[in-house]
Amino acid sequence: MRQKDYGIIIICLAISGGMFYLAAIQQDPIRQSREKMGLVMNAALENAPPSLAFATVAMGAFRGLVVDVLWMRAEDLKEKGQFFDAKQLADWITILQPRFASVWDFHAWNMAYNISVTIPNTQCQERWRWVRNGYELLRDKGIPLNPKSIILYRQLAWIFIHKIGDVSDDCHLYYKKELALSMRSLLGDNASNGIFDELAEAPQTLDEAMADEQTAQFVAALQKADTAFSQTEKLVEQYLSLRQTPDRFAPGAFAVIDQFRESSGLKKFDTFARASQIRHLWKMDPAYMRKMNQIYGPANLKDPNQKEPLNWEHPAVHAMYWAARGLEIAGRPEQYRVDEKNTDRIIFHGLQMLYRSGKTTLYTTKDGQTSFFQRPDLRMFDSCDTIWKKIIEKYEGLEKGNPKAVRGGHKNFLEQAVMSFYQAGHVNIALRIYKDLITRYPRDESGYEYEQYKLSMVEFAKWQLKSEFSSLGNDDATEFIMMVLREGYFRYAVHDDDEAAGREKMVQEVYAMFQKEHSDESYRFGLPSMELLRYMAFMDFLNDPEYPKELRMSLLGRIQVERPDLFEKLKKQEQQYFQELQKQQQAQPANP
């Protein structure tokens, strides 16, 4: 072999060695990138289904290539609008690569958003099934397999706060109602802190629950009354079904509940059953729910240190739960990540949503259907404000003191809160918020001082009102006043008295402002008397079929008791309504 050949061989070996070295030093960065993307986990898959266990072992190194091909095909089908076909491919990808968080994200979004809207909006029940499939996929499968992937928590929270909690879907009221009914069956109406204490401390397993003698006696009696309760794995589900639909079971089954109604055994088992359903069906921890109540719960307006439980019937609370869990389990507080910031935002947007619509009213209409209505909850202000300030502080450090969007949103929130509390009659709270607003945000980003912040709180509120309604014409002002008054009557009918009073106060100020603005043009401008507008709006409310008749009758009932003088004046004009009210009262059984 010639000298030249030896030289070539040595050079090739040197190049090969260098390439091996370069490949070796890339292993750590590649591994770190895979860990950040959630593609590598140290823990082995546990309790995996046979199909998943086979696929992850049998295909070996070729799984990645197959997943790449399937993923590209799924994206192509999505772009073409073939969502059902894309769903099937996503199913396969999640089996082949269960630790690929992006495909779980895509799969859930596809079902909750794309597939659901292909169903006509007249079939809300079917749409709801696909929305539920989307969040259940993440909650029950994706997150357990990828517990360190914050994008899955964020997506799960987003489905609750946007798809269910917002108004973008034509069936959003149906989604809200179904979620509220599901949670009310487990938590009851207006659950207290004591209820959450009991749920958090309830036994974790049936064996632990049965260790109580009276609980064991109750379960034994229930199993004796109906064989449907003999299967222990379905005992909790069947018991909760018995409480909701007793006609499905033998007559003696509900008699057992009546028999044990005063015993501690029934109460303890009922608490265990509801806690078990929350843990296993909803995948939420009652102890963490209690912690959420303590951190984010609504504060008593008279005593801010006294916190009430969150409204777990509201989709925003579920969004906050999963966002908070994601930040706790998968967050990295010392690093700035867009996904983490977006998850943080879900929490304070959820709090803001609760502030604006945190109270829910479920009522049964004459045809037996359940209707749903949301209204503001001013008690959420302190929690929302506190968390918002903490998030601003967090991102001031991570973004080098420049979280503009977060600060700007907080400023707008404070301005709106001043108006809301002032209109609701909570002047002292409005003044406290206003002082914080003008101290925290005295000038804009360019250094310009806000002139309106130099006004007193009352003058600022009037300035805000004037800036919003100064351009109203005669017809616009009349329409606005009539609509707000009708809304006020609705609030009064559902016993939301603070909001009703706020609507009344706003109307009076707009009316006075408009009349003063056009006092020199009374021959051309001018509104009817306030008494006439109020009466006409009241009659419009009573005759508006969009408001359930039960609520209209409820308003009349309150007026009859609390304002008998007004009741007599209205009696002549609305005789037919009062006759129906009297019939309803006569039909009700007398109290024993």
Task: Specify the residue positions occupied by each region the protein language model found.
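N-terminal alpha-helical interaction modules that lie
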Residues: M1-F106, N110, N114, N133-D140, ...
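Aromatic-lined, polymer-binding surfaces characteristic
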Residues: M111, R127, S149-Y153
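Substrate-binding clefts and substrate-entry loops adjacent to catalytic sites
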Residues: M111-C124
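Non-membrane alpha-helical structural segments and their capping/turn regions in soluble enzymes
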Residues: C124-Y135
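Acidic helix/loop microenvironments that form the catalytic cleft of cell-wall polysaccharide enzymes
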Residues: Y153-G165
